């Protein structure tokens, strides 16, 4: 794990590389992903079944591809009651939060009597990609399905890989909680292709959301425009601003909570106190030995971990804004004041009792967040990803009489005669 002072001679170069990180090099997988997409687009189910047999090692058909609601119910009934209660609590909290962010259709008349407005409409069909196998996270299903449900999407389809034809039990239970009626055992770029183009079994969707590996991210990038997507997600990342008021063990474990996700995950502490930074590093070395995913976390910490000692909290904030992290924790006595100064972060976790893990599961806000610095221009997944906005315009005689001449001047200046004429004939009719 790198330990750097901002006053170090090589700090600027190191931090510039950190800021300019990407969501992964897609060039190596682009040819293979492009071929998968083209095969599914051209051959539909035939290609889909071939790819599932190749990658997931089971032989599907149109019937076995679909996950039945009875499977979801059975999984839900069979899990531990405490876990069932936790999933239901998470569902309710995520639902409550997203209901508060529903955009509302509006209309109003301006001073010329022109009626203007915006109409928000849920999409007809949404495709949710949810990783499976060892990386099967029911929380990802909740975080993608709930905003689609709240938005009022007509049809929601889930695709998840099923190695050997088996789907993770907790994932099935989460599907039941969300009331999912349509789900398929297909993963990777194949699933993205099916949802983007449609096959004989899986209908085309209007949007594809959800996390995935580099193959899924590349596929989503390539089908964008054919359908909408949420974002191109890369490895998980956390940045923590903390000072001596924080418990160094707490901060160490918070950093490891992202490092255990992925060998490419990044965990960065920015602190104005060098002794505190050293204490956090000692606790990381102790705590990492206790993790079941210690080998993954160790690679992440060694390759992508950093403790940065800044001159003061103002510099900590400046560096965090430049980094634009997916997750930003602020563990200082004046955490709320520092949070007000943050412009670029996927989610901000404020105060000593707000570990990032609470946001991952059941605080309420979405855990699908922009990575790789894209928090500068992307927002977390929300109901807006499952809706579209349509402009509303209605002029009466008064409105076109008062605004028509200006409109004709602009049309004339752009050399668009029919535009000008469409206004002129109406003005003439009013004389």
Residue ranges and their predicted role:
Residues 322-431:
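C-terminal core of ALDH-fold dehydrogenases
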């Amino acid at each position: 794990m790198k330990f750097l002072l901002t006053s170090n001679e090589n700090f600027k170069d190191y931090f510039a590389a950190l800021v300019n990180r990407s969501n992964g090099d897609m060039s190596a997988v682009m040819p293979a992903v492009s071929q998968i997409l083209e095969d599914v687009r051209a051959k539909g189910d035939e290609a889909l079944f071939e790819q599932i047999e190749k990658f997931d090692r089971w032989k599907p058909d149109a019937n076995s591809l679909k996950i039945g609601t009875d499977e979801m119910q059975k999984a839900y009934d069979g899990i531990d009651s405490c876990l069932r209660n936790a999933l239901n609590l998470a569902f309710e909290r995520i639902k409550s939060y997203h209901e508060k962010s529903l955009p509302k259709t509006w209309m109003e008349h301006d001073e010329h009597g022109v009626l203007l407005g915006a109409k928000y409409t849920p999409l007809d069909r949404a495709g949710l990609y949810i990783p499976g196998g060892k990386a099967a996270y029911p929380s990802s299903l909740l975080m993608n399905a709930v905003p689609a449900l709240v938005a009022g999407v007509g049809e929601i389809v889930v695709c998840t890989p099923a190695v050997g034809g088996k789907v993770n039990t907790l994932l099935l239970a989460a599907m039941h909680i969300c009331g999912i009626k349509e789900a398929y055992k297909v993963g990777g770029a194949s699933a993205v292709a099916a949802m983007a183009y449609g096959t004989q079994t899986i209908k085309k969707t209007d949007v594809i959301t959800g996390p995935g590996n580099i193959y899924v991210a590349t596929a989503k990038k390539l089908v964008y425009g054919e359908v909408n997507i949420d974002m191109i997600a890369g490895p998980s990342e956390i940045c923590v601003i903390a000072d001596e008021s924080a418990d160094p063990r707490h901060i160490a474990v918070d950093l490891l909570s992202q490092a255990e996700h992925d060998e490419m995950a990044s965990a960065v502490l920015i602190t104005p106190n060098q002794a505190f930074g050293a204490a956090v590093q000692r606790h990381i070395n102790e705590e990492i030995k206790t993790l079941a995913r210690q080998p993954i976390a160790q690679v992440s910490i060694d390759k992508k971990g950093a403790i940065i000692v800044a001159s003061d909290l103002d510099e900590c904030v400046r560096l965090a804004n430049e980094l634009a992290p997916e997750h930003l924790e602020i563990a200082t006595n004046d955490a709320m004041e520092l949070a007000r100064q943050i412009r670029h972060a996927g989610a901000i976790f404020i105060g000593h009792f707000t570990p990032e893990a609470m946001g991952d599961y059941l605080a309420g806000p979405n855990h699908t967040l922009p990575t790789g610095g894209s928090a500068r221009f992307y927002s977390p997944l929300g109901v807006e990803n499952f809706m579209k906005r349509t402009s509303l315009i209605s002029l009466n005689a008064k409105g076109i009489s008062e605004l028509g001449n200006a409109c004709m001047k602009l049309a004339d200046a752009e050399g668009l005669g029919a535009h000008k004429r469409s206004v002129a004939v109406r003005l003439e009719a009013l004389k």
